[in-house]
Amino acid sequence: MHGLLLAGLLALPMNVLAHPAEQHASNVLSRRGVDIESFRLPLKAKYMDSDAAAQKIQAMSFSKDDDYVSTATKLVKSTFPKSTFRVVDDHYIGTNGIGHVHFKQTAHGLDIDNSDFNVNIDRDGKVFSFGNSFFTGEIPKENPMVKRAFSDPVKALKGAVKALNLPVKSDNAKAKTTAGKESFEFMGTTGALSAPKANLVYLQKEDGTLALTWRVETDVGDNWLLTYVDAHNSETVHNVVDYVASAEFKVFAWGLNDPTEGNPTSIRDPWTDSSPYTWHSDGMTKYPTTRGNNAIAQDNPTGGSTYINNYRPQSPNLIFNYPWSPTATPPSSYKDFSITQLFYTTNRFHDLLYSFGFNEAAGNFQVNNGNKGGRGNDFAIVNAQDGSGTNNANFATPPDGSPGRMRMYNWTTARPNRDGCLEAGIVIHEYAHGLSNRLCGGPANSGCLNALESGGMGEGWGDFYATAIRLKPRDTKDTNYSMGAWAANNPKGIRAYLYSTNLQTNPYMYTSVNSLREVHQIGTVWATMLYDLMWALIEAHGGTYSANPVFRNGVPQDGRHLAMKLVMDGMALQPCNPNFVQARDAILDADRALTNSANKCTIWKAFAKRGLGYGAKYDARNRTGSNRLPPGC
């Protein structure tokens, strides 16, 4: 779903814990003086975990002959009998046997764009868990389609451009009708990477009312925005969603995070069964370059929006062997090595996530889905040495069926300058934005990680996977890791604290979020909890540092890969725009679905250590922490 560093603030972030503050890079919109953070969607979601769901559905009648979509639909109808809604066309059954069905609430035939209901159905066809953010207030009695008393979509486009100071010229814009109710594409504009679009939708506001809005979509490179412009007053912008997730950090053989951990080595045929066409074919065409079914990698020194004709190393024999030296300068002198490294890391992470269940039906990034579900034609476009920025990286995640786009930058924090493609953790973090945005809320919805807390978790998941993958056989629970240290030329990395199980080294607790106002700060808290969880599972199940997990009945047999699998499964279970408590419950539910809750108490203890235990409560202004465990633990 939606992407995550919307706009880094130019001011230093507030950090009540006495520690050097993180420095956040500003993106295009913040440089234009627009604070996108102030336009984030409000958190509206509720989540009913498997225990609560079992109690609720006892009084409901379901037929054994119902398929999982029908069962889910009946639940939504019984929960909101007076509401209208539609089934989103992105339902699928995960590798853990859980069926995921997503619904969008409607009013007068128009979507309420931030009103979602997700239902998870177990292997026996029963409701496993569900979450929703459906609107419960009064629906406007007057159908806006009757009198058509709303603004012209062109005015909405111009309103979005003006309010956000977008680099889009819309003076000659004309709206062309497209498929869908009140859906338009704009002709005659310049400045956007693709033609802007507009859809008439309702939007839940913070005050509990509905606003009729034009959802204006503009892809301007570093920001791919959905701007909700009031349909009666085009100068009013209610909220903004950004598909682009930016990071603040930055590979060699899989498991080596950066050049300080080893040297480049030659690896033959590294793909797994997750890539049946290999990394250099999409099942129809074989490519003698860094292009295939999962990704297409190239340099992009100008920072432009086109990529097909950009430079890629060519090798008819598929031997991509290029020199690199830590003293080489500028980074463009080793662009062949850089592009190859980026292509390798991206594909390697694709294959790992596929083994965990991020496959075609779940909305992964592939051109050819091989009739396995989902929407194809959406490999990851990955740009090395992208000239549109420095000291950062980002990933844009549109809905399933449209390619993801990663931009990796050079870092000017060292002499010679460093190439972010050579720090695997940054590439993994960025690609993880694509993972979480496609899973949370369903592959067709890319706006479910746009609230402050859910957006923070989006950053945290990226850090977690980057850190989990770099673990070494010598590591113990006392091992600490930084994020982005090599690229930033700072051993402490780019986060406020090291990732550590030691509460003195990293004192972050659940209630720390009360004083944090930036997604990367909040993400560090969430990733810290997941780091504790991973080590708790390693202590319970042992660790393996092989590149590929070993499964038994679908369950990874070591704690490190089990943690990665459970965290990923939780993403698909939780509601749209979840909070920490709901995401914790979704991980517990993921363990119930996968192992019959074999790790229940281990998971509870890990979260309780950081104040997200039994009884912890979410409140946007005053979260309540708890170190307690539930009965039975």
Swiss-Prot record:
It comes from Trichophyton tonsurans. PANTHER family: EXTRACELLULAR METALLOPROTEINASE MEP. Binds 1 zinc ion per subunit. The gene is MEP3. One of its GO terms (molecular function) is zinc ion binding. Belongs to the peptidase M36 family. This is Extracellular metalloproteinase 3. Its main location: secreted. InterPro entries: FTP_domain, Fungal_virulence_M36, Peptidase_M36, Peptidase_M4/M1_CTD_sf. Residues 19-246 form a propeptide. Zn(2+) binds at H429, H433. One of its GO terms (cellular component) is extracellular region. The lineage of its organism: Eukaryota, Fungi, Dikarya, Ascomycota, Pezizomycotina. Glycans are attached at N410, N480, N622.
